[in-house]
Each structure stands twice: as C-alpha cells, then as structure tokens.
C-alpha cells in the first residue's frame, strides 16, 4: 500500500509542475506567425475576443482545479509517507512541496497564489513536524536544512528588493532539481 502512495505522490507532484503547460495546450490559445512577406504585410484577421476570453477562462479554471487537486493529494499523502520506516517518505514530501512553492513564482492570480503557497507552506511545516516526531534521529539535520532554506527564501525575496536575474536563475535551478529528484527518491523509498 505504501508503494502506491509513494508512486501517486510522485506522479501528482510531477503533474502539478506540468499543469500550466497542460492547461495552456487545452485552452488552445495560439499565435499565428507570418512566414512570407505577403503574410507580414497583409492585414491581420479579425480577432474574436469573446472566444479568446472564453478559452482563457477555461484554461484558468482548469489550472485552478488542478492546483487544488494536487495540493489536496499531497496533503493527504503526507502523513502516510511520513509514517514509513525510512525517512525517504518525508524527503519526498519536502521535495514535492518545495517544488510546488517554487512553481508559485509563475502564478499571477490571487486565488491560485493563495491556494498554492498556503498548501505548500502548510505541507512543509507539517512534514517537518511529523518527520521530527517519526524520525527523531534526523531532527537536527532537518531543522538546520529548513532554517537554511528559510534564510535563503527571505534573502532572495525580501532583502534583494529589485528583481535579480541571479535569484531567478537560482530558483529555476532549485525547482528543476526538485522535479528531477522526485523519481529517484520514489524509487529508493519503494525499494528500501
């Protein structure tokens, strides 16, 4: 049963990070690029604003529902993965919630931001508390890791006021690393 939850958590976390692209492809909002001189200088075709608005609303609604579903799935799986005999379940939860939190940088609507950040923050805090309780031998390294992550987050978001290209690249690299770590961690948690 634990193997199913580990696999489902990994798939949900990976799907959660691919949701914007999936919803954009379902919304079918496209740009027609001109390929010849005649197409460049031709008058543009009229745009049906009502259809574009409806497609945007459809894609945005699907994205919101998807984010809520992924957050709910991860929050339900978190106590089950923390109760495993190996601390890899807690690491999977932390990495999945951290990837969700880093993915929230690309959210532009308030309701999606509230859902994603609050679910990721709640998941990180609850995972930390539960893993310290279930695996007390890892309490000090986990606490130090979480403090370092919190310090880095505060420095990159509040101390450097201007948008820093370095901070953006570091966050992109951290998000990519989290996504890439999920399958090997799930494999190790299943096999150990």
What label would you give each PLM region?
Residues 161-180:
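Interfacial loop-to-transmembrane junctions
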Residues 117-123, 141-150:
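Active/binding-pocket-proximal capping segment
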Residues 2-13, 135-147, 170-175:
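Loop-to-transmembrane alpha-helix initiation sites
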Residues 149-163:
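Transmembrane alpha-helical segments of integral membrane proteins
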Residues 186-192:
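Juxtamembrane boundary at the C-terminal end of a transmembrane helix
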Residues 1, 117-131, 175-184:
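Small-residue-rich segments of transmembrane alpha-helices in multi-pass membrane proteins
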Residues 1-115, 128-134:
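Generic multipass alpha-helical transmembrane bundles of integral membrane proteins
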């Amino acid at each position: 049963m634990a193997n199913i939850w580990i696999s489902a958590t990994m798939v949900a976390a990976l799907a959660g990070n691919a949701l914007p692209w999936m919803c954009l492809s379902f919304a079918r909002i496209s740009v027609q690029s001109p390929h010849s001189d005649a197409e460049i200088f031709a008058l543009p075709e009229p745009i049906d604003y009502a259809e574009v608005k409806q497609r945007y609303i459809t894609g945005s609604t699907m994205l919101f529902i998807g984010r809520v579903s992924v957050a709910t799935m991860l929050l339900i799986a978190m106590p089950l993965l923390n109760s495993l005999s190996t601390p890899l379940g807690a690491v999977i939860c932390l990495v999945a919630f951290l990837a969700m939190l880093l993915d929230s940088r690309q959210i532009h609507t308030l309701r999606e931001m509230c859902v994603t950040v609050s679910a990721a923050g709640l998941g990180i805090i609850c995972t930390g508390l539960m893993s310290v309780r279930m695996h007390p031998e890892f309490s000090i390294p986990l606490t130090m890791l979480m403090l370092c992550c919190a310090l880095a987050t505060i420095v990159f978001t509040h101390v450097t006021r201007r948008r820093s290209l370095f901070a953006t690249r570091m966050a992109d690299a951290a998000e990519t690393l989290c996504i890439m770590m999920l399958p090997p961690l799930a494999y190790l948690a299943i096999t150990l």
